[in-house]
Swiss-Prot record:
Record keywords, A-Z: Ribonucleoprotein, Ribosomal protein
Name of the protein in its database record: Small ribosomal subunit protein bS16
Ribosomal protein found in the keyword field: yes
HAMAP family named in the record: Ribosomal_bS16
Pfam families reported for this sequence: Ribosomal_S16
Gene3D superfamilies to which the protein is assigned, alphabetical: 3.30.1320.10
PANTHER family associated with the record: 30S RIBOSOMAL PROTEIN S16, SMALL RIBOSOMAL SUBUNIT PROTEIN BS16M
GO biological process terms on file: translation
Ribonucleoprotein is among the record's keywords: yes
Length: 90
């Protein structure tokens, strides 16, 4: 089972809001997921991202692959840097 960290679209027409979910790669975009680890709101002037950093780092260490967009969001939040530092310190 390949696990991905990806965005799930919520909100209404023309007003998207996304949840950052951990899901099986075979599940549909808005389908079954394992855990919600954050949210992303692209419509506010400053893109608003909230994350459960400990849970994201745990899933990354277990081998979960972030999607391209989620990888960019995690990089901006500094989570990917922490992950790489913890990986190198082992």
């Amino acid at each position: 089972m390949s696990v991905k960290i990806r965005l799930t679209r919520m909100g209404s027409k023309k007003k998207p809001f996304y949840r950052i979910n951990v899901a099986d790669s075979r599940a549909p975009r808005d389908g079954k997921f394992i855990e919600t680890v954050g949210t992303y709101n692209p419509l506010v002037t400053e893109e608003q991202v909230t994350l459960k950093e400990e849970r994201v780092l745990e899933w990354l260490s277990k081998g979960a692959q972030p999607s391209d967009t989620v990888r960019n969001l995690l990089s901006k939040a500094g989570v990917m840097k922490k992950f790489h530092e913890s990986k190198l310190s082992k």
